[in-house]
Amino acid sequence: MLTLQRLSKRFGTHWALQELDLRVGPGEIQCLLGANGAGKTTTLNLLLGFLAPTAGAAYVNGIEVAANAVLARAQLAFVPERVSLYPLLTGLENLTYFTQLGGKELSSAQLRGYLDRVGLDASAVGERVDNYSKGMRQKVALAIALAKGARALLLDEPLSGLDPKAANEFCALVRDLANGGAAVLMVTHDLFRARELGGRLGIMHAGRLLINLAASEVSHTQLDQIYLDCMHDASAAQ
């Protein structure tokens, strides 16, 4: 479970995040939408313990991040926009390495099972990662998250640069993880697929959460208009 209580972050005189209240429970998907600089990635960095909050608190499964970042981070799986894998290792070797780094010893069959679960083609498992597409790299990153056993997943612009087929496959994997009980917080600019994922859609601007609605409450057209209205009203109020 991810819990944010009046979470705020200031850099000098600039408030990057202001009094964000949010809860993402097991099996739930929360998407954060907004322009660059809205505070979305700052939110992820606060949850990961990479930044210290100016005010408020972030919790991962009841662990306050600021008080024990290492323990809280161990409860999380994070897939950044640019996945960092060892390019000269294969997908299987990367999964093996990062799993062992996390203190887990899994058999080759178990590791291959995770790669199969995320849909990495069997013929690619033994190929070097520098030959992978971005979509294939994302699948390896998700396999690492699965093998880690984390119950909370943070995704930072995971759909950026993916072709439509790869983006749809990635979203299907995210839904499967949520259906399996994971709490998912995803930052994205893709309104269409954010709605398709289900869950909740939070629209942010200038560090504030303007609205947080259920995807089932709106059509794609309505979401587009709500997003534009929020951006217009927030800009006019500044």
Segments from the language model and where they lie:
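Catalytic Walker B motif of ABC-type/P-loop ATPase nucleotide-binding domains
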Residues: 153-156
